[in-house]
């Protein structure tokens, strides 16, 4: 007892851990796995943690999550889901200006619960087409119209009960022979409210789809019973002053991007991201000034940057937020190929510490593999995190599912991959290579395992961030950052063996289910 008893009191507590300034002041480039946050004191529940965060100077989100402007991550479906769950989606620009503007328009015109662009078939399609649609999209409740398109007269509906017990030799049957015909359907008129539609479905007790038709009996939308269940209430939804969902879009920094910008503004875009792998350029500075002169109220997210010196030029030009990251994404090989970039944790801390002096929020872009990485990025000063691979292969991500070795996958590629560059010149412009005869790839193309729906995945991420803040002892992300800058929040570097210890180890086999 006497060997270690020094004092009967507990007023003395030794100084422990490193401040953020000490952690990142040594000159080492650190990633999210290189350190941990030391826990604090808990006197509240996790669900009390406020995750409200600034996306830009004028746009605030209730959850700090942004989907990346990549052509295998964000189009209208992803942007809608992100906004409904409290974040925002940034529409990619590896497409025509008209297509991109139309995707933004879909988000801004979205009415909760109504599906305006469903899979539609015609009576002439075959049963095998339904099975193919089911394999691609994961469902087989499909409206049938006269010409197989929206806006055509409703002819019937195909559901799983119509095809489940058909023999393989019957897969060539025309849908007109087996579908539930129009006269046997319960429909709702255009203009019906979500509440009224819900009541109609409950009363009818027929099927899983409710077609919405206009006065000419033409299909204008559908409502799925499963969607009614999950769309009843989105208290965190990101909306503008007109109660429309928030939506962002990426553009380049070239002269022809000004036309794209005009179309996006006409579509109602809330923020534009100047999409460049290296944002500290005269091209981006000039584009920021042009936008601020022509569309004063439009929020401009500039980047990408990884140093305070880069950030200074974009802030001086009028940027409303900064996107931080260079070469840290899972499909990015910029650091390997060009020897330029910065480890992501260091980049986020250094740029955030500088930008906060001017009231400019930072988006941590790249290197996010787990919910723990999100918590670390936010604790280092980022206001929001941008996710690519973490959201790839969700139901709402663009692309079709395919199977490999029995695993359901979706394609995921970097915008600096040759695959993406070959699709559209916008991807080449992002890396200043549109005029090059020889393209230098700064990304790769691959596949990611099916993660299910955003509506299940994002709530898991939200809960994880809240529990992280609880362990830290902070009731809000604002408090987390205040603790970090004051030096109250402490960190500790991890050796390689510490990282092994912090992961799953010592098991013969295990199943890792996150939610």
Swiss-Prot record:
It catalyses: IMP + NAD(+) + H2O = XMP + NADH + H(+). Pathway: Purine metabolism; XMP biosynthesis via de novo pathway; XMP from IMP: step 1/1. Its EC number is 1.1.1.205. SUPFAM superfamilies: Inosine monophosphate dehydrogenase (IMPDH) (SSF51412). It holds the Pfam family IMPDH. InterPro entries: Aldolase_TIM (IPR013785), CBS_dom (IPR000644), IMP_DH (IPR005990), IMP_DH/GMP_Rdtase_CS (IPR015875), IMP_DH_GMPRt (IPR001093). GO terms for molecular function: IMP dehydrogenase activity; metal ion binding; nucleotide binding. K(+) binds at residues 327, 329, 332, 501-503. IMP binds at residues 330, 365-367, 388-389, 412-416, 442. It is an enzyme of class 1 (oxidoreductase). GO terms for biological process: GMP biosynthetic process; GTP biosynthetic process. GO terms for cellular component: cytosol; nucleus. Mycophenolic acid (MPA) is a non-competitive inhibitor that prevents formation of the closed enzyme conformation by binding to the same site as the amobile flap. In contrast, mizoribine monophosphate (MZP) is a competitive inhibitor that induces the closed conformation. MPA is a potent inhibitor of mammalian IMPDHs but a poor inhibitor of the bacterial enzymes. MZP is a more potent inhibitor of bacterial IMPDH. NAD(+) binds at residues 275-277, 325-327. The active site is at residues 332, 430. Residues 114-173, 179-238 form the CBS domain. Its cofactor is K(+). It is found in: Cytoplasm; Nucleus; Cytoplasm, Cytosol. Keywords: CBS domain, Cytoplasm, GMP biosynthesis, Metal-binding, NAD, Nucleus, Oxidoreductase, Potassium, Purine biosynthesis, Repeat. Catalyzes the conversion of inosine 5'-phosphate (IMP) to xanthosine 5'-phosphate (XMP), the first committed and rate-limiting step in the de novo synthesis of guanine nucleotides, and therefore plays an important role in the regulation of cell growth. Homotetramer. Belongs to the IMPDH/GMPR family. This is Inosine-5'-monophosphate dehydrogenase 2. It comes from Xenopus tropicalis (Western clawed frog). The lineage of its organism: Eukaryota, Metazoa, Chordata, Craniata, Vertebrata. The gene is impdh2.
């Amino acid at each position: 007892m006497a060997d270690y008893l020094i004092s009967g009191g507990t007023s003395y507590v030794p100084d422990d851990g490193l401040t953020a300034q000490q952690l990142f002041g040594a000159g080492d480039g650190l990633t999210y796995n290189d350190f941990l946050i030391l826990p604090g004191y808990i006197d509240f529940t996790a669900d009390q943690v406020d995750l409200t965060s600034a996306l830009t100077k004028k746009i605030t989100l209730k959850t700090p999550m942004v989907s990346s402007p990549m052509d295998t991550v964000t189009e209208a479906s992803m942007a809608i889901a992100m906004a409904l769950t409290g974040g925002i989606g940034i529409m990619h620009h590896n497409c025509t200006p008209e297509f991109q503007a139309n995707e933004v328009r879909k988000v801004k015109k979205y009415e909760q619960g109504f599906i305006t662009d469903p899979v539609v078939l015609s009576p002439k399609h075959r049963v095998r087409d339904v099975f193919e649609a089911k394999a691609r999209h994961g469902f087989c409740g499909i409206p049938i119209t006269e010409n197989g398109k929206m806006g055509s007269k409703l002819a019937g509906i195909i559901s799983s009960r119509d095809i489940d017990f058909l023999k393989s030799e019957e897969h060539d049957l025309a849908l007109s022979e087996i579908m539930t015909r129009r006269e046997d359907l319960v429909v709702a008129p255009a203009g019906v409210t979500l509440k009224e539609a819900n009541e109609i479905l409950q009363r009818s007790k027929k099927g899983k789809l409710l077609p919405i038709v206009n006065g000419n009996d033409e299909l204008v939308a559908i409502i799925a019973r499963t969607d009614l269940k999950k769309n009843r209430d989105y208290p965190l939804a990101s909306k503008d002053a007109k109660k429309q969902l928030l939506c962002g879009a990426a553009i380049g920094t070239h002269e022809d991007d000004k036309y794209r910008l005009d179309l996006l503004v006409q579509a109602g875009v809330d923020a534009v991201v100047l999409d460049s792998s290296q944002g500290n350029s005269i091209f981006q500075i000039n584009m920021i000034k042009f936008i601020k002169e022509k569309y004063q109220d439009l929020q401009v997210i500039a980047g990408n940057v990884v140093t305070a010196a880069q950030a200074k030029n974009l802030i001086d030009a009028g940027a409303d937020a900064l996107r931080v990251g260079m070469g840290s994404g899972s499909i990015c090989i910029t650091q390997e190929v060009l020897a330029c970039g910065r480890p992501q944790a260091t980049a986020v801390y250094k740029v955030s510490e500088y930008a906060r002096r001017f009231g400019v929020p930072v988006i941590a872009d790249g290197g996010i593999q787990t919910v723990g990485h999100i918590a670390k990025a936010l604790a280092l000063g980022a206001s929001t995190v941008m996710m690519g691979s973490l959201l790839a292969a969700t139901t709402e991500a663009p692309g079709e599912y395919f199977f490999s070795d029995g695993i359901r996958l979706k394609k995921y590629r970097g915008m600096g991959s040759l695959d993406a560059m070959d699709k559209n010149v916008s991807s080449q412009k992002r890396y200043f290579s549109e005029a090059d005869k020889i393209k230098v790839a700064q990304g790769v193309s691959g596949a990611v395992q099916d993660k299910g729906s955003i509506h299940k995945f994002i709530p898991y991420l939200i809960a994880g961030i809240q529990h992280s803040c609880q362990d830290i002892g902070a009731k809000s992300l604002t408090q987390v950052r205040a603790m970090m800058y004051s030096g109250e929040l402490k960190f500790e570097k991890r050796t390689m063996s510490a990282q092994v210890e912090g992961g799953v180890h010592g098991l013969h086999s295990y199943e890792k289910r996150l939610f």
